């Protein structure tokens, strides 16, 4: 892939996002529709009440359009790319439904947990159907254990992976700019892996998302003009999991996406500790809120988490 071909999907995702994001923000402000901040969060988040949300819709559309036209141009419109786009769109639609109920229907809890889970599992099932139809390998290389070649085990794993990481990224999306920056690092890492494997189709997918996220971050850094919403975070988590599966580097996500894992673990530990011992381990969970409650600025948390993610990704790329 030549330099111009490398820059094209990146710039396409970026330009489309930068052009249409201000229009989307303007529309939501005109309609006076924005995020309702829950009382359970840090008190100073109340000033963010009414901030436009669902910005993920714009960078998802940018990624889909860019991926398809660039893939056609480079003759890389493969089924791997289609199923990656399918997960991005379906999980984005789930998040959009959740956001729509919260923002336009004024029901702050959104979709019920079982509805969201059912949609995520359905998406995973369709992903698997196409995956197996194409004859892709269902051998799963588990570190320190070995290879398991069972279609049933692989299917269960894929469902858990897609559902787990879409929700993990969603949990991490709690302060301005955090997930956008983390996702840029994660997708960049998998794009490098895709180039190493000569998987140009998957690399195109990653590059268009990175471009869209860079464009989005212009409007999402503190003080955020717009949030990505569940439409963005659920889609990004599902897309990351899909890339790791398509590149047969599934467990790499535990290191490359270690921040998401820690965010999720902090919530689980907090809930378990409170239920069992009536004590809280953290001042607030997910853990980025713990640092907020400890006096860290959002910008300091962003930079610290981004740098940590870069280090984790660099370690993986250097070792593996």
Curated annotation (Swiss-Prot):
Pathway(s) this gene product operates in, as recorded in its UniProt entry: Cell wall biogenesis; peptidoglycan biosynthesis
Pfam families assigned: Glycos_transf_4 (PF00953), MraY_sig1 (PF10555)
Membrane topology label: Multi-pass membrane protein
Keyword Cell cycle (UniProt): yes
Keyword Transmembrane helix: yes
Single GO biological process annotation from the record: peptidoglycan biosynthetic process
Transmembrane segments: 6-26, 54-74, 81-101, 117-137, 145-165, 175-195, 200-220, 226-246, 251-271, 300-320
The protein's required cofactors: Mg(2+)
Reactions listed under catalytic activity: UDP-N-acetyl-alpha-D-muramoyl-L-alanyl-gamma-D-glutamyl-L-lysyl-D-alanyl-D-alanine + di-trans,octa-cis-undecaprenyl phosphate = Mur2Ac(oyl-L-Ala-gamma-D-Glu-L-Lys-D-Ala-D-Ala)-di-trans,octa-cis-undecaprenyl diphosphate + UMP
Role: Catalyzes the initial step of the lipid cycle reactions in the biosynthesis of the cell wall peptidoglycan: transfers peptidoglycan precursor phospho-MurNAc-pentapeptide from UDP-MurNAc-pentapeptide onto the lipid carrier undecaprenyl phosphate, yielding undecaprenyl-pyrophosphoryl-MurNAc-pentapeptide, known as lipid I.
Protein name according to UniProt: Phospho-N-acetylmuramoyl-pentapeptide-transferase
């Amino acid at each position: 892939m030549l330099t111009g071909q490398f820059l094209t999907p990146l710039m396409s995702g970026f330009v489309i996002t930068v052009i249409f994001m201000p229009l989307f923000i303007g529309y939501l402000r005109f309609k006076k529709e924005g995020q309702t901040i829950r009382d359970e969060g840090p008190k100073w988040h109340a000033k963010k009440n009414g901030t436009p949300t669902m910005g993920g819709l714009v960078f998802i559309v940018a990624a889909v359009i860019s991926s398809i036209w660039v893939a056609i141009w480079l003759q890389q419109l493969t089924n791997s790319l289609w199923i990656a786009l399918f997960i991005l769109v379906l999980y984005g639609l789930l998040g959009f439904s959740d956001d729509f109920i919260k923002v336009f229907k004024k029901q702050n809890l959104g979709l019920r947990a079982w509805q969201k889970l059912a949609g995520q599992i359905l998406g995973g099932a369709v992903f698997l159907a196409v995956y197996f139809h194409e004859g892709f390998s269902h051998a799963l290389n588990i570190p320190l254990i070995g290879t398991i070649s069972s279609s049933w085990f692989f299917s269960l794993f894929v469902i858990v992976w897609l559902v787990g990481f879409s929700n993990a990224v969603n949990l991490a999306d709690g302060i301005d700019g955090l997930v956008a920056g983390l996702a840029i690092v994660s997708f960049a890492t998998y794009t490098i892996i895709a180039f190493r494997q000569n998987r140009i189709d998957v690399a195109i997918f990653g590059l268009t998302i990175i471009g869209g996220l860079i464009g989005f971050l212009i409007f999402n850094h503190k003080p955020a003009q717009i949030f990505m919403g569940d439409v963005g975070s659920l889609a990004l988590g599902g897309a990351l999991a899909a890339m790791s599966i398509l590149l047969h580097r599934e467990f790499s996500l535990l290191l490359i996406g270690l921040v998401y894992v820690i965010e999720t673990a902090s919530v689980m530990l907090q809930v378990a500790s409170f239920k069992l011992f009536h004590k809280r381990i953290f001042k607030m969970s997910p853990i980025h809120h713990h640092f907020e409650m400890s006096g860290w600025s959002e910008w300091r948390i962003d930079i610290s988490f981004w740098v940590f993610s870069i280090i984790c990704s660099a370690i993986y790329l250097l070792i593996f």
